[in-house]
Amino acid sequence: MEIRFTRAARSQFQKALRFIASDKPSDAKNFRLTAERSLGRLSDFPESGRVLPEFPDLPYREVIVSPYRFFYRVENDVVMVVGVWHSAQLLGEPE
C-alpha cells in the first residue's frame, strides 16, 4: 500500500521538523527517521493506527511519534496522511 501526504500534512510535517531543528538539529533528523519508519509500517498494516479518540465515528486513525500525532485515512490502496499536529494542540474535526 502506498503512503501519501496531503499538501497541508506535508507542510505541517516540515514545520514540525523546522521547529525541532531550531533547538537541536540532530533531534529533527531522528524524529524524521522515526516518523518515516512508523508511517512505513502502515504499508503492510494500514489499520494498525489507533482510531481517533476525539472522533471515533470518523474514518481516521493516528500514529503517534511523540510529541506529534500523524492523522491518516485509508483510501482504496493508499494511506493518506491528512494532518500532523503537536499533541498539545487542540484537534478540530478532520476535513
Positions of PLM-derived features:
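Enriched for short, Lys/Arg-rich terminal
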Residues: V65-E95
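Basic, Lys/Arg-enriched alpha-helical interface segments
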Residues: E2-Y60, V78, P94
